């Protein structure tokens, strides 16, 4: 006999960050790499709000404990990756949330990446200063 699912898994990506998210029904709080969310992001409230957006939108903020393992990139990219992963995990928990999450854009992988530096240029597009004489 199949057991009832006790947790929902979702993988999120943003820039070079990859987040593996577990939603556990009945718990509360967000734990990132073994630390509390506020501690992990160093008190940057905007990043905490980004992570909680899918939960707030679907009114499931206090219904799930969120445990995250995230690697790569910086704080902003990691927050975006976690948001993507949480949205995907919520979809597994409740299929009826798909329309709201899709409309808010939380299920779409943000494909923007850093443009590579080209030879003969100082950065990706910045050219060396031009001198007529």
UniProtKB/Swiss-Prot annotation:
Disulfide partners: none
Gene Ontology CC, one term: cytosolic small ribosomal subunit
Residue segments, region Disordered: 114-133
Cross-referenced PROSITE patterns: RIBOSOMAL_S9
Gene Ontology terms: biological process: translation
UniProt keywords, alphabetically: Ribonucleoprotein, Ribosomal protein
Residue ranges with Basic residues bias: 118-133
SUPFAM superfamilies xrefs: Ribosomal protein S5 domain 2-like
Gene3D superfamilies according to UniProt: 3.30.230.10
GO molecular function: RNA binding; structural constituent of ribosome
NCBIfam families the UniProt entry points to: PRK00132.1 (NF001099)
HAMAP family assigned: Ribosomal_uS9_B
Similarity annotation: Belongs to the universal ribosomal protein uS9 family.
Name listed for the protein in its UniProt record: Small ribosomal subunit protein uS9
Source organism of the structure: Fusobacterium nucleatum subsp. nucleatum (strain ATCC 25586 / DSM 15643 / BCRC 10681 / CIP 101130 / JCM 8532 / KCTC 2640 / LMG 13131 / VPI 4355)
């Amino acid at each position: 006999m199949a057991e009832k699912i006790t947790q929902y898994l979702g993988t999120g990506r943003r820039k070079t960050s990859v987040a593996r998210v577990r939603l556990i029904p009945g718990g509360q709080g967000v734990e990132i790499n073994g630390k509390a969310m506020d501690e992990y992001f160093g008190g940057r409230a905007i990043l905490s709000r980004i992570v909680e957006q899918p939960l707030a939108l679907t009114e499931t903020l206090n219904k799930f404990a969120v445990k995250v393992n995230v690697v790569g990139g910086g704080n902003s990219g990691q927050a975006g990756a976690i948001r993507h992963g949480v949205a995907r995990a919520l979809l597994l928990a409740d299929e009826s949330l798909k329309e709201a999450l899709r409309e808010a854009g939380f299920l779409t992988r943000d494909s923007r990446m850093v443009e590579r530096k080209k030879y003969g240029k100082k950065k990706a597009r910045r050219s060396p200063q031009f001198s007529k004489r």
